Every structure is written in structure tokens, then in C-alpha cells.
Amino acid sequence: MKSLALNYVLQTARVCISGSRPPLHLLVMNNSIQTIPFTNLILAFIPAIVVVVIVWRWGIGYKRSIYALARMLIQLLLIGYFLVFIFKSDSSLIVIGVLAVMLFTASWIALHTKKIPRRELYLKSFCSILLGGGIILLLITQGVLNLSPWYLPSYVIPLAGIIFANAMNSVSLAVERLEAETERSVPYEQARIIALRASLIPITNTLLAVGIVSLPGMMTGQILSGVSPFIAARYQIMVMCMIFGSAGISAACFLAMVRSNFTTKEENI
């Protein structure tokens, strides 16, 4: 069973590097790879249940934790079935539609500020994530991986999710810190620098800790699937670079676009 998983992953890696069109069995899920039975998956909920009990005993509000766990379970099961449909469809239009939904949603979620209505900043949030995330996604899928077809769902959608999510978080941190600094009457140019630095703190810490404190999710998943750690490390390097790039570019673009929203006319002049 392990050899089947290794063969599947290595075949996928080879066709991506060579640029040739993968066979149909690589475009869809490989049913030969061992799955986790639901009865075994229940064991993974034991630590979560322990936390819920602790929260309940401490009177913090256990209902929210239960709701979060239930929602997580439903969302992941639904997205699993949805992705199976997308992978089997092999349609560029469906992939583009999914990317559009991800982009529009990320642009809206990124804006948590309460002082300025989201609608005033939404277009700028959208453009910044599109520029920062879209360019990185294009570079990775067509430059690094050289996917064929270019819309290969099993690669494009997961990579887009990673890129857009990190760009979204970076923009969210940037706007929150920018708002806090401008409320303290800090000049915009200085506030922008502080906001950009704050938006890059999480990913910078991750870069410093990767490989020493923790093994990232993608690398861990590949190693568990039987992939050589050297191959997994290359993929993880690619992922870390695209995360850092999308986060920094998106935040910088957003901070450059929203100057008029956080300054007076006199300051702009």
C-alpha cells in the first residue's frame, strides 16, 4: 500500500516537472491509496473533546467550541466531495469559477476594520490580493511546476487556497495595524511601514522556525505518503517562498492603495 502511494506521488511530480499532460488516472483521485476509516478518524477527536471539557469546566463557553468543531467537520466533508467533482470534471471554466469565489471571499474577509466600512476598501483589497496572489499563483503553476494543462485542478486549487489565504491574512493584519496607528495620529508614511512590518510577522516567524521547530503541513503530508524528504523539502521551499511573496506583495499593494482612505485632503497635498 505504501508503494502505491509513493508511486502515485512520484508519477505526479514527474509529469509536472516534464511539462507533459498527466494521464487521466493522475488527474483524478487514486482510489488505491489507503484512506482513514471513519471509525479510526473518531480517535482524532479525543484531544478536541478534552479541550471542550476543559473549556466547559472553566466556564468559558463550550458551545462555541462544539459549534466550531461541528462546522469544521461538515465543511471539510463537503469540500472533499466537491473537490472530487472538480477533479473529475477536468474543466477550466469550473476551476476559474472556484478561483473567483476564493478571491472575492478572501478580499471581503480580509477587512475586519470597524471604523471604515468594508465597501469603501473592498475593491482595493480585491486588487491587492489579485495582484499579489494572482501573480504568484501564475509563477508557481506555469513557471515552477509547468503544469499541463495549466488549470490542473488537483494542483491549482490547493495552491490558490494557500496563496489567497495568506494574502488575506496579511492584508487583514495590515489594515488593522494601519487603522490603529493612524488613530494615534502617526503620520501615514510611518504608519504604513509599521503596518507592513506587522503583516509580515507571522510568515517571518514561520520562515525562521520551519525545519527546526516544526515541519509544515505539506511536507509532513508528503513524508507520511512515502515521498523522499528531499523531494518534500523542495516542494515546501516552493510553498514558503510563494506564501512570503503573496503576503508581502498583497500587503504592500493594499497599503499603497488606501492612502486616501486614511489621510485628509491636506495630508495628500
What are the residue ranges of the model-derived segments?
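Pore-lining and gate-forming transmembrane alpha-helices of multi-pass membrane transport proteins
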Residues: 157-161, 231-252
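Membrane-proximal helix-loop-helix units in multi-pass membrane proteins
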Residues: 138-187
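Hydrophobic alpha-helical transmembrane segments of membrane transport and translocation systems
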Residues: 242-269
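Alpha-helical transmembrane segments of helical membrane proteins, especially in multi-pass transport
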Residues: 166-180, 189-221, 250, 254
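N-terminal transmembrane hairpin
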Residues: 30-147
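Juxtamembrane helix-boundary/capping and inter-helix hinge elements in multi-pass membrane proteins
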Residues: 58-59, 180-189, 224-230
